[in-house]
């Protein structure tokens, strides 16, 4: 069998093997894993001499591992395996062996096997496990034995003590027992072995020393700390911390020694013990010496700077400060311990801020958690004593300084986009820290930041364009953030009132900024910041309107900037600025339109085959599509400033026409080419339609803001946009087979609603004909139904006749979509969306008292299909359809209320029927009982309906209870007789209590509770 196994492994891992043969080999090896005898053959193959190939030995050992970990081996088998591996290790790793030691990957696998045996036999069966491998490490000149011993110790920790791994309760108990046994039997000798190895190899083998230190760092979390914190051990580790290579290269031993101290400090212990330990280890001196060492001090700012060491020290300081803060947060600590902790905090704060200010952001980020903990603690203290308050200025200064671009940064360089993104992420973290400082001492932040900004403007006045853009950017960035102090409902405190001092300082900053001429500075980052700030603090310009012409002039100039990142971002910011200040800038609408008219022509570019599909859509995306998306903001901006209340309607129409006429001409030129299949022409038509819709959105948004309700645009405006709608409908009629064109038209239609008013209604049949073509997907139909809901709501008093004409063809398209075959997940999702929007559309019709249109002479032919479709949706309880089901039940309940006639039964303590049903539609009373009521019990009996455990199903149950009550109110005794004579006998239940609740309880809850109990008892 040995040869068969070896052959199978060789075939399976040979890339040149026949695929069919390889498949057979893998199948054979998988069978071996479950064969209770295979492990014996495999261990023999692994340990035999001469050795077979490494891949065969590795796979054999993997099969053995599987057998041990899955507990295939009994006690006798484990004993045999122990003896086999112990003999093998003694033969290969004894130091004087003839056999060569295994390569690293095989040693790892062997260590794993031995660790599994340790778990299974250390308690009973291999009590000498540690001694056996320690003996190898203690032999003179036996480096392989030392490495194996340390590998095993590391693996044991990973198996039984690694807190990052999730464990079952049984595994956790087993691991705790093993740790207790180790502490009892072998921990003293293990700790002594670490000392011996450090002493023996400190000047001989860095690899052994590094591994020993890492092993100590792992084990220290669960052993007696005094085994590590003693004079002998410290005297061995300290020299390693202070090592410096003359060449300036990294030192893994030194870094590991620092990490070991970090793990020691992180060990959980009483606050008083933690403070004592930090003092005993003299970590303040250690950290200070490390930060003063050449790799972190003399070589700062050079390629020799040791970032690995800096990160290691940062981890140590982060752990130290976090632990000291935890001591201070503990309200139960004695005064002596608190005093020591406060002194430690003062001792380590300079080191913390030095690392926080490190030029490498990864070093800075390492200490942010402890700085956050410190600031959180200070915020909880309340009124700060001088001991704490004197810490804040250096902390805030460090935060602000770190927000500055470093000297090597090259803003806007395409090659540095990743660095730029990382820096912006760091700025977000720093902003949170700055907020934390403000929450502790707001006035300190106000004063420091005010001085920073004032000094910047003073320097700008003196140096002009010679001033470093990084300093300007920092000051502008702080102005941008300053509003969180000055304005209400911002920052950590969520203030309901602004800070008067901060608001006053912000107003001064804004005035200085506008007056400084900074908008003419040469660096693009500064220009962007300027526009961002003007847009953010638009309320300043509402109060200080004298600055608006100057700022608006700057915006008009900057939207023409030749830097693409500025130009496209400025289009959006310009739109935001004029939108929020439309009332103040409307008087110069004509001038603004003329000034930016050269930016309005649309030039669609078809993406090439090499276009980056993953291109970001943010401001760093300069693709043609992204540029056009930004260009649309200009159209909306024009709509905003053209439609203010101060602008005469005739002028509004004139402005709209001046922008749209070139678009009409351009579209008429491209439609014929688009019909011929020219992709550029299709895209051009798409873009023009989007621009028309976006312009309309600007007008509609302005009217809505003025009226605070459904806009009623002036005839001069609606006439112009009626022409736009006609032009779009022409394009839609010619190109409605093209999905992108339909999407653009649908978007434009939704935006035109606000400026067309009731004038849109006569065009509705054309919109439906165009947007719901044979090519339309269910997703498109769902989106259009959502738009029609808006139309019905806005024009409910005028829409009846139009709705009466268009309803049947509309519903026929919807019915067709509902019955389309499903091919894959996307189709299923689109169908769910169509179901939801269909029943929501019918719900809106009924809610707005337009239900008569559903049963009018024009639409009677589709009424049966309408009801049938709604019932089908109501009883479809698949995942993703429960919302549609609930709405469908609500729709049926509304139909029952509207067409069931007057109430003939009263619900109360003495229920009674006062007459025969008189439905508005003949026969509808019996229809409700048979179909609506029958539907309710069909759903209740569905195994997938679980209202006891699912919230959405519970909502459906509420609707079911509601519709049952409506049916009873409309039909009275006829419904009761049906329940007693048909429903209850068919279900085999006693419905007496249900009938009592249904006829006496005006609330749905008792009925729902009874139904829940029924379902719970029957499942």
UniProtKB/Swiss-Prot annotation:
One BP annotation, GO: tRNA processing
InterPro entries membership: ARM-like, ARM-type_fold, Exportin-1/Importin-b-like, Exportin-T_C, XPOT
Keywords: Cytoplasm, Nucleus, RNA-binding, Transport, tRNA processing, tRNA-binding
Entry's localization field: Nucleus; Cytoplasm
An MF annotation (GO) of this entry: small GTPase binding
Broad class of the protein's primary localization: nucleus
UniProt-recorded name of the protein: Exportin-T
Highest taxon, organism lineage: Eukaryota
